[in-house]
């Protein structure tokens, strides 16, 4: 390891000052020592701060770092970190020994002082007893308070804390009485039962109609008092009543009798998403619209103090209102215990979408991560459809079952939420930053032409059915930047229809794919939920034997300059793939599957030309279809 780099990294680790990591210096060292070939990924991703210490395999793989490079870099840093930790532990042990000696001396001195103080306090208390009993009690309390600094007055402290505890208990009882009256009381006699909506472990939800009113309905959940802690039920009712979010069910009142609690809420006649997805799966656009609003509700719940954990998010617990907006329901009220300090809940029944870590627990403990995992599974359930997974095993979704035409941003989001890596699950705020939850999904084919979307053009021309092409990207015309701003999916689709998708390497035409709607929407199922893609591939002997050839082919093409052209619009893939290394992984996975289907048993040392040809054809075909599809649909402005 380079001496200057060792000194530099050591100073960072020693001071825990990771924010000062000089990205350029690290990259230079990595490049000079050839520790990582694709060092540019560090610069692209702006790896700074605590990332130096917490560069997990998942992060590095997503950045496009190969397995060999990953192990090399991590081993260098681990050696440095371990050396620092060992030295630091030795120093801590020495300091602890010194502190223990000092503490022993201080304790001996304090004990002597405490004995003297106690004697003085007792004398004062005796004198006060002769004068006035009431004054005696007060002075004793004063003496006790003054003596709290002594280490031998635990008995006095215990009595004092007991008094405080009693006061707090009394206050909490008063608060509970106030909270019990906070939720409006409904008169159940004004409603008549219509039908059952759902049946739970400890509760039944029914549809009720207001007497004398034809179209006034409410939903009432009946909870058996004997099956749960009544105090907890009251607490949960008040907590749920205080929730105020447009996509979370709102309690409108409650009542109780000797056997049951009755909790009333608005009735939603459209039913749950599960009911709707039984007919057919949701489109990605519709699933996204619902998911964004549910995520907003989850973030609201998790941001409360203490946070509220739903613990059973699924399509069956999401209703649709009159505008088809989602309403998250059923916060349970069926928990065995609720830890007031952490609000973590344990449950007597297993949730529908249980994360692997929850499945492995004898006593199931739920946290915010539980909700995030089940939320991702709910998105999966909407897109795939209920019937496709009504007979699934272990309630674990299979990302390879996703529809072929999903956008790359959707696959990445689902991979992060329900992928194999359980230790790096994003929270609700992390999810809201992902592109899929932020960007709008434009229709693949829109009816309007380019002339309808470019209102800033000032040229006066006769009406034409086909819009004029923009100036060449190499032109120095002042209007070039204006044209770049108005690049839309419509522009690219029109150009694609006219001239097809052309792929150039070093300016030479390598592949010409004419426009075809079915071919254009061609897509591949990509297991983006597998963070250790290269590692998994290496374990598969049938696939790994071609991995080096594919990587060499791709690196060679990107180094020479790979460009997609749709008419006069072009996209420099050599630059784009550095920003989105996940595309490289998807290409590699596709090519490996393609070669495996050919059942090629030739040795690595004797590579037939047919393998290279298959790699080239598959490479260009994948780019001209799937990659082009993703950029035209999601990032048209990247074309120039």
Curated annotation (Swiss-Prot):
Region described as Disordered: spans on this chain? 84-165, 448-482
Please write the reaction equations for the catalytic activity of this protein: L-seryl-[protein] + ATP = O-phospho-L-seryl-[protein] + ADP + H(+); L-threonyl-[protein] + ATP = O-phospho-L-threonyl-[protein] + ADP + H(+)
Quote the catalytic residue positions.
312 (proton acceptor)
Which InterPro entries does the record cross-reference, listed alphabetically? Kinase-like_dom_sf, PAK3-like, Prot_kinase_dom, SAM/pointed_sf, Ser/Thr_kinase_AS
Which residues are noted in the entry as ATP-binding?
Answer: 197-205, 221
Protein keywords:
ATP-binding, Coiled coil, Kinase, Nucleotide-binding, Serine/threonine-protein kinase, Transferase
Gene3D superfamilies membership: Transferase(Phosphotransferase) domain 1
Looking up SMART domains in the UniProt record yields: S_TKc
In what residue span(s) does the Protein kinase domain sit? 191-437
Protein name per the record: Probable serine/threonine-protein kinase samkA
Source organism per entry reads Dictyostelium discoideum
Recorded name of the encoding gene: samkA
């Amino acid at each position: 390891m380079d001496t200057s780099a060792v000194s530099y990294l050591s100073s960072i680790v020693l001071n825990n000052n990771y924010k000062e990591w000089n990205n350029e210096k690290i990259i230079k060292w990595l490049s000079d020592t050839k520790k990582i070939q694709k060092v540019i990924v560090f610069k692209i991703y702006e790896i700074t701060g605590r990332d130096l210490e917490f560069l997990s395999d998942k992060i590095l793989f997503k950045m496009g770092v190969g397995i060999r490079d990953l192990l090399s870099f991590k081993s260098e840093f681990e050696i440095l970190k371990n050396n620092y930790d060992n030295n630091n532990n030795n120093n801590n042990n020495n300091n602890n020994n010194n502190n223990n000696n000092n503490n022993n001396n201080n304790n001996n001195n304090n004990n002597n002082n405490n004995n003297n103080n106690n004697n003085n306090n007792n004398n004062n208390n005796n004198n006060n007893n002769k004068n006035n009993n009431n004054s005696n009690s007060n002075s004793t309390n004063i003496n006790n308070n003054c003596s709290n600094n002594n280490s031998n007055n635990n008995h006095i402290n215990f009595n004092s804390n007991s008094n405080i505890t009693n006061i707090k208990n009394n206050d909490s009882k008063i608060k509970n009485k106030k909270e019990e009256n906070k939720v409006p009381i409904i008169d159940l006699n004004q409603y008549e039962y219509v039908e059952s909506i759902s049946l739970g472990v400890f509760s039944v939800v029914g549809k009720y109609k207001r007497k004398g009113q034809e179209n006034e309905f409410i939903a009432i959940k009946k909870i058996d008092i004997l099956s749960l802690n009544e105090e907890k039920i009251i607490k949960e009712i008040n907590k749920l009543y205080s929730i105020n979010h447009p996509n979370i069910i709102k309690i409108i009142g409650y009542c109780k009798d000797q056997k049951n609690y009755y909790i009333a809420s608005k009735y939603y006649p459209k039913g749950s998403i599960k009911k709707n997805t039984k007919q057919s799966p949701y489109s990605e656009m519709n699933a996204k619209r619902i998911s964004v609003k549910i995520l907003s509700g989850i973030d609201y719940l998790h941001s409360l103090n203490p946070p509220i954990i739903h613990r059973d998010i699924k399509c069956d617990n999401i209703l649709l209102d009159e505008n088809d907006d989602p309403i998250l329901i059923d916060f349970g009220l069926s928990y065995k215990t609720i830890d007031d300090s952490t609000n973590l809940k344990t449950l007597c029944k297993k949730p529908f979408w249980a994360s692997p870590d929850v499945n492995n627990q004898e006593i199931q403990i739920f946290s915010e991560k539980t909700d995030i995992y089940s939320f991702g599974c709910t998105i999966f359930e909407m897109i795939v459809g209920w019937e496709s997974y009504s007979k699934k095993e272990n309630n674990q979704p299979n990302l390879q079952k996703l529809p072929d035409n999903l956008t790359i941003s959707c696959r990445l989001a689902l991979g992060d939420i329900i992928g194999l890596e359980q230790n790096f699950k994003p929270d609700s705020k992390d999810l809201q930053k992902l592109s899929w939850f932020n960007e709008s999904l434009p229709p693949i084919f829109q009816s309007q032409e380019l002339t309808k979307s470019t209102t800033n053009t000032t040229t006066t021309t006769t009406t034409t059915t086909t819009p004029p092409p923009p100036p060449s990207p190499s032109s120095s015309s002042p209007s070039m930047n204006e044209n770049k701003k108005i690049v839309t999916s419509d522009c690219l689709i029109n150009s694609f229809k006219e001239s097809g998708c052309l792929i150039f390497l070093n300016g030479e035409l390598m592949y010409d794919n004419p426009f075809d709607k079915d071919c254009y929407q061609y897509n591949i199922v990509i297991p983006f939920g597998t963070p250790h893609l290269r590692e998994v591939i290496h374990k598969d002997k049938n696939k790994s034997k071609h991995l080096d050839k594919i990587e060499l082919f791709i690196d060679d093409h990107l180094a020479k300059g790979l460009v997609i052209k749709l008419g006069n619009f072009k996209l420099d893939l050599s630059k784009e793939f550095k920003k989105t290394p996940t595309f490289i992984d998807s290409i590699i996975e596709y090519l490996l599957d393609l070669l495996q289907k050919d059942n090629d048993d030739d040795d690595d040392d004797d590579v037939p030309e047919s393998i290279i040809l298959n790699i080239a054809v598959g490479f260009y075909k994948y780019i001209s279809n799937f990659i082009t599809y993703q950029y035209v649909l999601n990032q048209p402005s990247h074309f120039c």
